[in-house]
Amino acid sequence: MRSAALTLLVACLSPAAFAADPAPFFDGKSLAGWEGLPKYWKVVDGAIVGSTMPDGLSGHNTFLCSTRKYKDFELSFQVRLKGAGANSGVQIRSEVIDKDKFVVKGPQADMGAMYWGSLYGERLPGGLMKASPPEKVKAVLKPDDFNDYSIKCVGKHVTIKLNGETMVDGDFPNMDDEGIIAWQLHATRPPGMEATFRKIEFKEIK
């Protein structure tokens, strides 16, 4: 009887019950689970580094994109930008619209002069979705050092924090229900720019 019961139990288990855990958001060693133009992206000492140095990048922004789509999540990391006019960001609930250049459309948690902590609509009508308060950014920003940055996305609600201070906290009803996450390198003139994302922590919210 015990043998028969065990056989029945195994037979009833779906293949999903034996499936491996999903791949980590970022494994800290490689760009497994991510896609982009290889010349611009690498992993250094556990950090994602994007660089357009020394030639810059003209004509379009480019992105390192997750191969998975995500709905609700929390993402935190430290970011440092180098280079005159350096600008970057993290796309949320977005989509790739040009796979050859890895051009992306959707909401972006922005980083760079005049945009730190804002929610920007990359290739969306109207551009800026919600500006961060300039006085709050000025009070906490470390322009030449690593800054703590966090993004929480639940339903249509987005919260962005810079060095612990809330910069955006609101509902965005036109935002898609799911999409990719992507790290941005903004188009820049020579000698280009560099963005380093380290201490990356990610949690899906079920």
Locations of the language-model features?
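Positively charged n-region of N-terminal signal peptides that target proteins for export
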Residues: M1-A4
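Bacterial N-terminal signal peptides
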Residues: T7-A16
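Carbohydrate-interacting regions of secretory-pathway proteins
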Residues: F18-K206
